[in-house]
Amino acid sequence: MSTVTFENIFHGDSADLGKLRFNPVGFGWKAYQSEDNNPTTYNGSDIRHATWFRVARHFQLRLGMRNSEKPRISFDGFKRDDLDKIKRTLQEYFNITLETRDTSLKGWNWGEAQVKGSDLVFQVQGKTAFDVPLSQVANSNIAGKYEVALEFNPPSNYKFDPKDLNKRPPDEMVEMRFYIPGKSMKKAGSDAGSGGEETELDEEGNEVSAADAFHSLIKEKADIGAVVGDSIVVFEDCLILTPRGRFSIEVYADSIRLVGKSTDHRVPFTSIHRIFLLPKLDDLHVQLVLGLDPPIRQGATRYPFLVAQWPKDEVVNAELNLTDEELAQYPDLEKTYEATTFQVVSRVLKALTGKKVTPPGSLRNAQGLNGIRANVKAVQGELYFLEKGLIFISKQPILIDFSKTDSISFSRVGGGVASARTFDMRVVSKTGGADHVFSAINKQEVGPISSFLQSKNIRLKNEMEEAIVDIDEPFSDDDEEMESPSEDERPSKAKNDKSKTKPVKKAADDDEDESDDEDFEDESSDGGSPSESDSDDDSGMASDASDPMMEELRKKTQAKRTKAKETSGSGSEDEKPKKKKAKKDDDE
């Protein structure tokens, strides 16, 4: 049996070179690096048509097949001189005529988009600029009034090997947008004459835009809307927080679909790797969180988490569209459900995906609820402590695993009243990644959080001050009199203070009397007695001694008063040198 062989040929999108061999029965391709393996073979009788293209990797032979699973097969790497040889081989062995198709090289981004068979073809002046297999279209959305966005899933058959960079996954296009203005036109009826066109109308009699018609055609041809098999159950009008919108959740045997007014998302069960069921802190709603890998996309935004929300008391009656034989394959499923919506959805997904539903941990906040309120930068959210990690629920949820956490530290930023009531929690990663800082946490949660993390053997660091004096608390007149020493006590008191070493930061109450004496001595260095107003001001400042901001303000105020007294001319000229001398003596 005679054969025809072509060397250095690529099969489809593969980066491996191989050889392509034809014989009267069929043809096959085998990579050079897998000589011991069996080649990929095809039956010659399955070929419907053949096309010759100019592509990036020289020339391409594209074969349309009768097999619905692989409607198109392509081989790249042919030379220009191989055209005649390919024509003779296909004609002789399979009685197939090779069609040569020109490629548009103008580089225009405007033309005509047509659906031909199983391909979306974009033509410029009658020549093909590019074509896209509809089998690779994962989703189609109306991105604007006249825009249609096609999304593509990256190939899942690539395995990344960090030791071999040649086998890394290639760069893939993930989205393509078409701008299609105008209204959709269709051929008019026979009464309007041949060749006439009229505006297409929907069921309600409204005009259909060209973008909507193109979107519907892509969904129909790419089988986006028609998942294989009937849906098992449908949950209508569900509020999805991430990505935000109202969707109907259609559950199938191998995936779920989120169907919205202008956006659809299909999530295979193989993409769901975590399921969380978390009650909100308002005690009125419950959130179902799905961790996705790969994440779903909406425009240029990736969503690695899908967050749905239902009222806590919402009840649903659901009947699964499964036969008794199919139901027997899922022991945890029931034929009918009558319970709260979040319980029914979580139980169905748990049974179909085989994933465990993770509840919140044993930590309770000051109000006895699961979770605490916190901020990440300027984003407010809810932080939940799980048995094996943390999860922060917001527009972009954050999941932290305890096994990858090096330490967690508590700190307080600033010295004002607001910062005294809250603290920050910093999570340091073992892998050297960016730290996660959760701020504006109520200080009442320090104890429960510390106890919970210590039970998980997490290394903790407490960098907060031990005590903070409330600056709003007034001092009584008796306290002012007790804190004001006599003139005879001032010098000896000052000397004793100078002889003492500065202690490490402790509670502000321990240093309050000493700071008052020093302030009084500095302010009364001219030998006079402080006025009544000065005493009142000083006593007020003394109560703020523990606050760094108030301490700085007090020093500035005293400096202004001293400067004002020196420039006012009060006292004789002979007393001024005495001031300096007294100050010098104090310094000594």
UniProtKB/Swiss-Prot annotation:
Name the major location.
nucleus
What's the gene? POB3
One GO cellular component assignment for this chain's record is: chromosome, telomeric region
- Extract the InterPro entries matched here: PH-like_dom_sf, RTT106/SPT16-like_middle_dom, RTT106/SSRP1_HistChap/FACT, SSRP1-like_PH1, SSRP1/POB3, SSRP1/POB3_N, SSRP1_DD, SSRP1_sf
Q: What is this protein called?
A: FACT complex subunit POB3
Report the protein's function. Answer: Component of the FACT complex, a general chromatin factor that acts to reorganize nucleosomes. The FACT complex is involved in multiple processes that require DNA as a template such as mRNA elongation, DNA replication and DNA repair. During transcription elongation the FACT complex acts as a histone chaperone that both destabilizes and restores nucleosomal structure.
Q: Biased-composition ranges for Acidic residues?
A: 469-486, 509-525
Task: Please describe the quaternary structure of this protein.
Answer: Forms a stable heterodimer with SPT16. The SPT16-POB3 dimer weakly associates with multiple molecules of NHP6 to form the FACT complex.
Q: Per its UniProt record, what CDD domains does this chain match?
A: PH1_SSRP1-like, PH2_SSRP1-like
Task: Cite the record's Basic and acidic residues compositional bias ranges.
Answer: 487-500, 573-588
One biological-process term from Gene Ontology?
DNA-templated DNA replication
Species in which this protein is naturally found: Cryptococcus neoformans var. neoformans serotype D (strain JEC21 / ATCC MYA-565) (Filobasidiella neoformans)
- The answer, when asked if Transcription is one of the entry's keywords, is yes
